């Protein structure tokens, strides 16, 4: 039976989806370049940045589920989610800017390594808290915006289209705007912060809350966590999504190093008769993945409609693992470009096919508890996937240390790397990516909420929500 909820207006769908551009831009630029900036440009040792990344992951273990729980239990005249989004938006944008351009430090802050390290730690934690509060509440609205399966699929696809553009901006513009020595990153940070602000405001304007979703109070915090962790399907989903998020983070963080040293992008080259400088090559290399992902969205959407999001996601894991192995072989920009474009075809499926599974999980949970607990589920999901930062940071620190990676020094922008370090960069880019996606495929094998069972859950949840709406 179709959903009895009011249809979601096109303007709300477009505005809500537009928020994905700023979400993806800020996250992608941060994950792709912030470690490169502090290690390779500002000279902080990789092992210390790895420690900060581990602390950052533990911090997420606290703020993600708490943010979700607070949101689930919030009751105001403006709703549960929107007040949190309003309060976190401006601090999010300010801390995003300060990540790139240390306050009072100028383009080349004359700070000690210890000062930069503690500044980095403080701003990362503040930025992450604000980002988590906004994005968790914005994401938690996804199942609430519509209960209709077709509209959910369309809304998810729309979000990911905007997300692709955000990812493109986040990976392509920073090296172009900042320059080879990153001395222009102040202007870069200002522009990216402005685009992020506008996009998140649009996402806020498109957000729509349904009063029946707040009709029943959520259980206390400990009980909420316990219920979530007893959900077998959710646990298998968390394992798979952790691996998928590691892939996004690991590739984003490794590609700048891989491009500079493995592909030897240190000067101009020619592509289709055009001369590209090193900065533009870096941008094109990363942009190729997302440009390939855009047309592939239609293919993955068709596969999801035909076979279900669950089966399509498992297939995306396998194709992604197969193409990731290719990263072991290129040694030139042109060959690397083929690899990122091929991986982009699978990237589209990995990006768009996880949220529909969480929506089904929250629908089934409502049937069991009577309460809508998107905040807790997305918060717990945020907690677990943030451990991808810990995994990525630790692996990067270990690989760089063990393989003998050489940091640039004064007057030496392109130090000669030993063969062991080059292999380590190939391992970070291709090997760990392939292994993580195989692990995600295995985890999804334990997820049972798909097919006829998922359709039955959606139908029963829609009927329950209709009864709640009539009782208001």
Language-model features: locations:
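Membrane-embedded alpha-helical bundles of multi-pass transporters/translocases
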Residues: 2-472
């Amino acid at each position: 039976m179709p959903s009895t909820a009011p249809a979601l207006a096109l303007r709300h769908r477009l505005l809500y989806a537009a928020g994905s551009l700023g979400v993806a831009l800020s996250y992608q630029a941060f994950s792709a370049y912030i470690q490169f900036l502090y290690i390779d440009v500002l000279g902080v040792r990789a092992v210390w940045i790895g420690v900060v990344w581990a602390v950052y992951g533990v911090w997420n273990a606290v703020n993600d589920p708490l943010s979700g729980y607070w949101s689930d239990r919030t009751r105001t005249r403006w709703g549960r989610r929107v007040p949190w989004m309003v309060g976190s938006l401006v601090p999010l944008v300010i801390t995003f800017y300060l990540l790139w351009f240390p306050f009072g430090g100028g383009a080349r802050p004359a700070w000690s390594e210890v000062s930069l390290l503690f500044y980095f730690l403080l701003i990362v934690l503040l930025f992450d808290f604000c980002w988590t509060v906004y994005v968790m509440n914005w994401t938690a609205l996804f199942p609430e915006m519509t209960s209709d399966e077709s509209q959910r699929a369309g809304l998810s696809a729309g979000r990911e289209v905007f997300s692709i553009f955000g990812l493109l901006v986040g990976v392509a513009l920073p090296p172009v705007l900042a320059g080879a020595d990153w001395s222009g990153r102040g202007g870069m940070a200002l522009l990216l912060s402005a685009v992020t602000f506008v996009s998140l405001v649009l996402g806020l304007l498109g957000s729509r809350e349904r009063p029946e979703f707040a009709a029943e109070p959520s259980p206390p915090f400990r009980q909420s966590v316990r219920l979530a962790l007893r959900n077998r399907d959710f646990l298998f989903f968390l394992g798979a999504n952790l691996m998928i998020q590691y892939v996004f983070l690991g590739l984003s963080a490794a590609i700048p190093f891989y491009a500079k040293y493995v592909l030897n992008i240190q000067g101009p080259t020619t592509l289709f008769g055009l001369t590209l400088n090193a900065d533009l090559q870096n941008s094109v290399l990363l942009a190729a993945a997302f440009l390939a992902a855009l047309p592939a969205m239609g293919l993955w959407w068709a596969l999801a409609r035909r076979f279900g999001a669950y089966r399509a996601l498992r297939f995306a894991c396998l194709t992604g693992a197969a193409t990731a192995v290719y990263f072991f072989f290129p040694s030139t920009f042109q060959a690397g470009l083929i690899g990122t474009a091929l991986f982009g075809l699978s990237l589209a499926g990995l990006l768009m096919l996880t949220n529909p599974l969480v929506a089904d999980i929250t629908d089934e949970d409502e049937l069991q508890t009577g309460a809508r607990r998107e905040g807790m589920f997305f918060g717990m999901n945020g907690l677990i996937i943030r451990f991808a930062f810990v995994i990525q940071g630790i692996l990067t620190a270990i690989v760089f240390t063990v393989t003998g990676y050489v940091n640039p020094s004064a007057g030496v922008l392109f130090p000669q790397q030993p063969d062991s370090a080059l292999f380590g960069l190939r391992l970070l880019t291709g090997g760990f990516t392939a292994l993580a996606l195989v692990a995600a495929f295995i985890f999804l094998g334990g997820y049972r909420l798909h097919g006829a069972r998922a359709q039955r859950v959606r139908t029963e949840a829609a009927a329950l929500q209709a009864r709640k709406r009539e009782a208001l």
